[in-house]
UniProtKB/Swiss-Prot annotation:
Region (Disordered): 1-59
Keyword DNA-binding appears in the UniProt entry: yes
Low complexity composition-biased segments: 35-48
Family: Belongs to the PDCD5 family.
Transmembrane segments: none
Protein name listed in UniProt: DNA-binding protein VNG_2008H
Gene3D superfamilies named among the record's database cross-references: PDCD5-like (1.10.8.140)
Organism: Halobacterium salinarum (strain ATCC 700922 / JCM 11081 / NRC-1) (Halobacterium halobium)
């Protein structure tokens, strides 16, 4: 470089800092990738349990709900999994049982009557 020892030292420190930042970024990417893989495995396990515990009709109903109300479908899935894990369901949940579960989870909606004079 310019031959000045301070400049050379400063350049060396910059290079070290760049290397540290690269290593930190690569470590963060690996950690993020591991988290994504874990989430994907959890989702696959959940889907396998749902497939095991729901009939085709009940699964179709749940998928239809997921398209319009994803949060509500997630809540229903959690309820189905909890019922299955606790052993409160014998066999598979059919469409009628799924309707009942959805009715229980559905928030009470208030209806308003408007009277015109």
């Amino acid at each position: 470089m310019s031959g000045n020892p301070d400049d050379d030292r400063l350049e060396e420190l910059r290079q070290r800092k760049k290397e540290q930042l690269k290593q930190q970024q690569q470590g963060g990417d690996a950690e993020r990738e591991a988290q994504q893989q874990q989430a994907q495995q959890a989702e696959q396990q959940k889907q396998a349990m749902l497939k095991q515990n729901l009939t085709d009709g009940a699964r179709k109903r749940l998928n239809t709900i997921r398209m319009s109300k994803p949060e509500f479908a997630e809540q229903a899935e959690q309820q189905v999994l909890a019922l299955a894990q606790s052993g409160r369901v014998q066999g598979r949940i059919d469409e009628d049982q799924m309707k009942e579960i959805l009715r229980e989870l559905k928030p009470d909606s208030q209806s308003f009557n408007i009277n015109r004079r």
